[in-house]
Design a protein with these regions (language model features):
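Macromolecular interaction modules
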Residues: 1-234
Length: 234
């Protein structure tokens, strides 16, 4: 499941507290996996920021758990509600076409994680939308960008009352310089290459509506507890 945290951006002390004190409290609940993403000063000036929600998303918490309505989830929501203006949770299914690099527990993942909240257009049925997103778009995204980690979360349903409509939450890892340089973001050799890569991406995202009504949140990513033991650095 993924929890979105919404509030006023720019509070680095909040970001630090979320990935330390608050994360310790969440770890104590015993969930098999926990990751925290924060929109901190390291990524705050990113060019890759799009916002439709008010207040905007300033952090996300991912919890791997066997029970979406069990104490791992209810305890986390209770703890997080006092930390920001709005807390919403979504049950998701995770696909990982490009696994992120393993990190030590609590260490910052290299680069930055660009998190996108996607909505399925009303004129696309679910089967077509998933096919265009997963089957058609995935190889284009990997080929045209400098991505070194790619996680796709399809939303099954919201877990909190009144949660904004979100149909997918995508996390892509990029070099940190990509927050300020489109050439780095797209892995382009020159202006002509950049134009070609951008055109291919626009055509691909337009096919499933990811070019509109989307939020993109630049974040620093911290895996506090990996649910996959083989991924944990020794």
């Amino acid at each position: 499941m993924i929890i979105t945290l919404r509030g006023t951006p720019g509070d680095d002390s909040w970001c630090t507290r979320l990935r330390t004190e608050v994360s310790d409290d969440l770890l104590a609940l015993g969930a098999p996996g926990l990751a925290v993403n924060v929109r901190d000063a390291t990524v705050g000036d990113s060019l890759m920021t799009l916002t439709t929600l008010d207040p905007p998303v300033v952090g996300l918490v991912a919890i791997w758990t066997q029970q979406s309505y069990g104490p791992h989830v209810t305890g986390a929501l209770d703890r997080l509600r006092g930390e920001c203006d709005r807390v919403d949770a979504y049950l998701v299914t995770e696909s990982v076409p490009l696994p992120p690099p393993a990190t030590a527990p609590g260490a910052r993942t290299p680069g930055f994680a660009n998190v996108a909240l996607l909505r399925r257009p009303a004129d696309l049925d679910a089967e077509t939308w998933f096919a265009r997103w997963h089957v058609d778009h995935t190889p284009v995204a990997i080929a045209t960008q400098s991505t070194f980690g790619y996680v796709q979360n399809a939303v099954v349903r919201p877990l909190t009352s009144g949660a904004p409509v979100v149909d997918a939450i995508v996390e892509e890892l990029f070099p940190l310089a990509a927050t300020r340089d489109l050439h780095v973001f797209f892995g382009a050799a020159d202006d002509a290459d950049l134009g070609d890569r951008m055109n291919r991406m626009v055509a691909s995202t337009s096919a499933f509506g990811a070019n509109r009504c989307v939020d993109t949140v630049p974040t620093s990513r911290y895996v506090m507890r990996s649910p996959f033991a083989a991924e944990v650095s020794q």
